[in-house]
Amino acid sequence: VRYESAATLVALSQSAAAIRAAAACYVSLLCTASDNNVKLIILDRLVDLRQQHDGIMQDLVMDVLRALSSPNIEIKRKTLNLVLESVSPRNVVEVVQLLKKEVLKTQSKEIEKGAEYRTMLIRAIHQCAVRYPEVATSIIHVFMDFLSDSAVTSALDVMVFVREVMEKYPALRHGLLMRLCEALPTIRASRVFRIALWVLSEYVESPEEVSLSMAAIREALGPLPLVGLRGGVTSGRAVGGK
């Protein structure tokens, strides 16, 4: 009944008050409905409303994010897409803080498709940081913990994000370089390792940074030489992944 009432309200009136009331009704249903198909339909209606009435969802973004509690990955994906289209300077800090908490939750093995969900969250936060650079400094150090993620996509997204932050915020470089040196020996994916090496070679400047970087690289490589006298691989640490 509430769904039909909201749909009727949208059909009969295009006033801002009517659209806001309908959107609030949809969001309330989104958070209380138990059927995943119903949630997906409601998300589609909210997307339509946002497209027709730009800005209407900005005050409801935090309520929409409650739908992330659903274990269904498609509901999570549609919710994040809707939120990214509705984020604004007024709510971006709150949005990013909530998404950061969700990222930390994905470390639990109890979360279904945790690696895929973590990748979605990291990319969502990355997009927010690109559009609103002021939020980047509040989350970048948390992200560094995921450079050793076994999910290559997540780790790669984090490394690309770190590289962008270093490029745009020179004042943050030293701290991030130190964290990167700490994380380097734990990185598992070769693609992530390559970007990390590029970042170190590009932004390391002081003798202290050079010394720490070289020590981290040596630790990551393992005992030398990497190849024995007859071409056999020694016990040196290999970085895996694609």
Describe the role of every protein-language-model region:
Residues 1-242:
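Extended alpha-solenoid helical-repeat scaffolds
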